[in-house]
Amino acid sequence: MKTRTLKVLKPTLALLLAASFSAGALAQEVTLRLVSAFPENGIYVQRLLPWIAKVNAEGKGVLQINFLGGPKAIPTFEAGNAVKTGVVDMAMNTGAFYTNVMPEADFLKLTQIPVAEQRKNGAFDAINKVWNEKGNTQYLARMVENQPFHIYTNKKIDKPDLSGQKIRISPVYRDFFQALNANVVTTPPGEVYTALERGVVDGYGWPIGGIFDLNWQEKTKFRVDPGFYDAEVSLTMNLPAYKKLTDAQRNYLQKQLLVLEAENTFWTRYGNVETARQETAGIQTIKFDAATSKAFREKAYEVGWAGAMKQSPEVAARFKTLFSK
């Protein structure tokens, strides 16, 4: 009787052990939910999707990313808080869109050195100290750089003065455009086309690339040169979710994030292509003389850092040292 019982138990025990090992293996794979604060048809998402596919293809059994979508999944200005509270695990976002979480998020526009150097000189660690403490967020990687912002307008100007113009803004250039005497209007990117069409705004601020993704070229007459600041689009992650990752998962994610950042050379080429496309589309360039252009850029940074100092003096002082050339 004992012999028979053992014979029955042995296969059962083997099955239980196999199931246990299988469950253990599955437990080592984590799936992270990611949203984009930008529209899905835009260049930023289009650059992100192949990276997600690569992460998933190479990360089976370790880490997967589930892309939930753009603003239809989580509205643009709520994505930062969704990461902070853990509604989602990750977001592709820009600091200007989550100043409601912490004002320091907008300071990233003022970086004048590449992200690779930021990782070496302590800037990246300084960013994460603030993001961890104030945003319950881990700053993972910067995937867009070398994309200066520009003023786009339907009213021609011959000097850096936007008096009488209604300009769509985000926190990125609110202070600067107000210093140029603009009447500023805040609206999500998805509503700008209609605002231009109806004359609610005369122009807007945006990087050198991306206006074709939103069809804004159809309602835009002029671009003001030179550009200023540097468009920042980054991946962020809920801090508790980040800390929950195993060493293997965290190391794998970090490896893939560095691969993503290494592709940032794309943005300089893209900016050149977009400049040519704008000219072909009939957008005229407004240029100032050399002295005025230099003063224009200097004023942008002067105003930007002044605003940062008012909002968070200690952090701004630390960042200015690390972000400047």
From Swiss-Prot:
Keywords: Periplasm, Signal, Transport. Solute-binding protein that binds phenylglyoxylate (in vitro). Probably part of a tripartite ATP-independent periplasmic (TRAP) transport system that mediates solute transport into the cytoplasm. Residues 1-27 form the signal peptide. It comes from the Bacteria. One of its GO terms (biological process) is transmembrane transport. Phenylglyoxylate binds at residues 168-173. Disulfide bonds: none annotated. It holds the Pfam family DctP. The complex is comprised of an extracytoplasmic solute-binding protein and a heteromeric permease formed by two transmembrane proteins. This is Solute-binding protein Bpro_4736. One of its GO terms (cellular component) is periplasmic space. Belongs to the bacterial solute-binding protein 7 family. It comes from Polaromonas sp. (strain JS666 / ATCC BAA-500). PANTHER family: EXTRACYTOPLASMIC SOLUTE RECEPTOR PROTEIN, PTHR33376. The keyword Cell membrane does not apply. It is found in: Periplasm. InterPro entries: DctP_fam, TRAP_DctP_sf. The keyword Membrane does not apply. Transmembrane segments: none annotated.
